[in-house]
């Protein structure tokens, strides 16, 4: 018996006891270093806490790649067949290819974009995200955008927010999701 055969039924039972069918569940995908080991982990966000449900050790240093990410997600997506899931990822997971793959799986996603990514505002008018005019204390939304000049993937919604400066707390940059 392997870990998945033991662990996944426990996860499925917990999901059934905790969430209603067809309920939206948020999953965070993240990579971390632990004692010179690289761990790719997927967690359920429940009551503002990330509960790990799957992890894999990567046999390398550095960032994960699309193949490793989709392999990990492929293992856990079937556990959520009765739910709507949204995958959340930071800048390591800002791949347009990952977004397309998630969309093909019927999975919603919020993936942080890099500030030097381009979006098409109008026909053939491209703008680097950092040049959209986002300033501390502001936010805006771009709907149905085409993302990245090289891949030109249509139909993305891009949310932009830069936290307001408050006393000693100043966010260094805005977020583009």
Regions from the PLM with identified roles:
Residues 28-40:
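An active-site-proximal beta-strand-loop segment
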